[in-house]
Amino acid sequence: MSARGADLGRLARQAMIERGFEPDFPPDAMRQVAALSGPATDGSTRDLRALPWASIDNDDSRDLDQLTVAEELGDGAVRVRVAIAEVDTSVAKDTPVDRHARRNTTSVYTAARIFPMLPEKLSTDLTSLAAGEDRLAMIIEFVVKDDGSLGVSDLYRARVRNQAKLAYGSVGAWLAGQGPMPAPMAAAPGVDAQIRLQDRVAQKLAARRLEHGALELEVLEPRAVMQDGEVVDLRQQQHNRATQLIEDFMIAANGVTARYLQAKGFPALRRVVRSPERWDRIRALAAGLGETLPGTPDAKALADFLVKRRTADPLRFPDLSLCVVKLLGRGEYTVQRPGGPAEGHFGLAVSDYVHSTAPNRRFPDLVTQRLIKAALAGARPPYADDELEGVATHCTEQEDAASRVERQVRKSAAALLLRSRIDERFDGIVTGASPKGTWVRVLNPPVEGKLVHGWDGLDVGDRVAVRLVSVNVERGFIDFVRAG
């Protein structure tokens, strides 16, 4: 059953404008890009093109920001190199493209359309780490010891070449023994052994973080499936060993970058999640499930509780995860001044963290890249502290706005898909119950809607049969009543 995507595209653009984004690039930015004759080059940098680099991303991603490669050193230690797209050389500070990126601050991904932070000639071509292409990159290098702790690290620029463009789904299935070796991997000698090695290292990194209280959450994010411009299905985005591999490597790389800037006496645009103010409510959730959490925020205790609940009730765990995420509060960007107190990331259980690994997609990462390059060159920081403060505040606000745009379009896509299924019955789980209303997550297709009648006696986690009574595509409303 399909639904028109044209309406969804219009709603996505409308949502962008309403949230303060500029969905189109201004003429001066496009003129700047048109004047670029090719990708940036620098013959003075290290030449690492012969290494078996590979990218792992979504199936349809063309804005490739990262490549990874690993090398065994002995005694269980492994050297990891993460190559990050060199964007700053093609997008100088205070140019038209930079000013547009600074206003939007992020790429926005909706089912109907992607609104890239940078023009596609850059993000999917000249500054993308595309397969088979020579590119400049920022290298974040670190040694992972046998126990998952980090050893020596370094940052430098180099030339790289992506030997295999891989996708999360096929790599994850292959790693789990549930699918064949992906064709691009089979065509690139040595990449299969590389990914196996990287998977082992990533598991050590993850285990180390979990020991220190990193939270292992599972929030369901349905994605609209488009075919010939129409919404044909909603599917959950599956996390697997391939997504975990990249997440663990990027977390490590971001920490190395934060500590590098600190050691150089540079300011940094830190990514923080503060200690949760609503810890009392998280404790109440745990108590309702027969568990006790400490009186003050304790990441390790919360992590242990979540691991236990995932095992005890995997069906309801995504809903518990969503509640915890909301109670933890959103992440934000802050300025870390040299010698000043550092704020950490509660959810990742790390004290030093920046965003540095996606400069094609996020403005904070481009800012961080400029800071790194200045530090490497022995130059002054390209941003004054007060300018960084403004960037941090604006990026936090725009990230929240982008999430709202993406959520609004997901809801409208779900309403589009369901509008021909009025009066059908669905099985669901109550995900929210308050004076503002009762909300139900339907299992198939994976959508959430409001229970407008028959909510008496229901609470979060209860299973319930519901009947669809109305949808509003424009507003993304889906209304259910309790089925008799």
Residue ranges and their predicted role:
Residues F480-G484:
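Short, compositionally biased
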Residues M1-F21, F25-D462, V471-I478:
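Electropositive polyanion-binding surfaces
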